[in-house]
Amino acid sequence: MCFQHVKAQNTPVLGWRSNFSYTDVKSIVKGNSSLYAATENTIFAIDRAEGSLSKLTKINDLNDVSVGALGLMPDGETLIIGYQNGNIDFVSDSEIKNLSTVKDFETTQSKQFRSITNNSRDIYFAGDLGVVVYNIDRDEITEAYQNLGQEGKPLSINQVLIYNDSIFAATADGLLAASLASNINRQDFNNWERSLPGLAFSNIIQTNFGFFAASDSDLFKRENGNWIFYQNLSSPITHLESLGNEVLVSSETQVLNLTESSLESIYNTEGDGTRINHVLNDGSFIWVATDGLSLQRLIKGASETGIYTLDGPTSDLSYNAELFGSKIYLNTSTFSDLNEENSFSLYNHEDRNWLNIKPSTTGEPIGQIIDLVQLNDEIYLASYDQGLFKTNLAGNSEALISSNSGPVSINSSYNLSSITTDEEGLIWASFYDRESNVFSFDPSNNSWENQSPSHPFARYTTDIFIGPNGDKWLSVDPNEGGGIVVYNETSNRERYLNLNGGQGGLPSNVVTDIELDQDFFVWVATSQGIAFFTNPYGILEGGSLTASVPIFENRLLLRNEYITDIGIDPANRKWFGTKSNGIWLFSETGEELIYHFTINNSPLPSNNILSLAIEPVSGEVLITTDKGAISFRSDATIGTDEHQNVKVYPNPVAPSYTGQIVIEGLVNNAQLKITDVSGKLVKEVRANGSTAIWNGRDLNNARVKSGVYLVFSASQDGLETYVAKIVII
């Protein structure tokens, strides 16, 4: 087995990098020069001559994510993308043309496209709304066949076949056929002939030896105008491809070659859990799209296979991004979405590689991975039902809860809801709906200690945050009262914070994240906005306590916004992820908006932000959404006490360049004065940590003239200085 693999590339300042998962490939199409493969949320291309791989994403100007179907224009070069929301892109070497007619159509029905069929100058888009016909010459949608179900009810169309003067359709309720004659109204369901109603059909094709259609694991053939049962396979059929005298048939577990006289298995998954989704013969190789093993290339009759994939996490649905050193970890479960996916992902900023790890113990996979920490270069993972484990990069794991000590499993589950670490090297763990609900674990001697507070709401802890003085902040399940229980196991003091004034004054009792900034303020994200506590050391001192909320544009910052996660960057600026409104970046105090990224003004794949993590050396912000992960490289990086390896780029600056000029390697939070060669001040800039940007404009916001400009950089006290030169052409 050989691998063709492309790893992540370095990202420019203020640039974006996609981090989609390429593990599960759903479909493939063959162009003249490239193969195109679609995952759930993105596309990649394989150069048929060189075998090189490249990404197609919103970063390089696609208009959407979540792919429904792929197709090709008659030229064999222009890729057609039908998205799950009804949007359509036509992608050629020279341009990307968008058609949003279906996307913009107002309906409560799903608009997902499921297949694309090319017929001369007409392109047929089949999907949940029915069939949409796009005419190439008129560059518009010319027909739409909706509500083709019995009695005119909505009916999902999975694939269409054009043969002579007729159109056939594989649908969720049988097979349909209608005449393409100009005098036939195909928008009227009465003009469609129905066969085998009650059966859901996924595919329909025409070969030199007949028509075939697939329903679940059954293959049907059309003879003398009637559809009859032909063959049953051992697993559901996922795709049919006609090769004239042969048919490639893929089921969930095997690929078969069907001729007029035989049915031969040419590839199977050997019970490894891999699901086959699609198959394609490009004349030289057979390509198999799978869940689990990305895109495989087969040579008929040979045992050797090749795997083609790009670097990325194990899943597009990743939670709880956590930074430890230069590594960011993602897990595939969260308290509100437990699943048995037994893997987690690690992104290493030093070598810019993703590593996907499948942990197991005594040969059994570990699922419901809800949290991760790294301590002394060891990885510890929390499985909601199976407990705490120490694991390595190979996935070999050791259970750390024994029957002799520590938490107790009830009904085959520990209900381990979160873990974190303290400055003394202990791991703190919460156990949901348990009388003993908070424990500390000492990895040096594998010992557990019950540290449960007395407050009844602590029983329903979903997350733990440890304050700068060691106080434990326990986020409480909103379904059990919500809010925060703060306690200190040494002083035995505790306090419950909620939305009531004087008792915390939180915007909401639904607490989603708690973070500490560089001023030792504790920021709390809730379903109704953001708040912060300026003195976390005094939380347990008693007295009235109400959280502060920044004021932005004469109102409470992000009031009524569902905040999902908080990130603090090296400039102490605040990043806020939201459930439906993208991601916001505010100044240190929260009073100045710097960026607000949504799907409409950025490559974000979704406005539903699940989590974020900031790597301070590069300034890269990893953002996970419900439709995949993406990174934005901000201009805030961790600073040092002196200038180190100062770089200015681009330099020289071309006349056509309109982006930001980046100056990095500066002393922490340097003050920069930019002058012309005569010493006239052009611009003053302050670095965010060790990085500053200049837009090439002067104090009056006019673009500077061609020439040489000097950058004088100095530390806050003026003792550490540096001079750089920028050439504007």
Annotate the PLM regions.
Residues 721-726:
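Edge beta-strands of extracellular beta-sandwich domains
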Residues 671-682, 709:
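Short, glycine-anchored, charge-dense loop/turn motifs used at functional sites
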Residues 641-673, 691-694:
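Glycine-centered coil/turn sites that cap beta-strands in beta-rich domains
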Residues 148, 686-689, 727:
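A generic structural motif
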Residues 687-718:
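Short, surface-exposed loop/turn motifs with a glycine/proline- and acidic-biased composition
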Residues 7-645, 681:
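Carboxylate-rich, polar loop motifs that coordinate divalent cations or form catalytic acidic clusters
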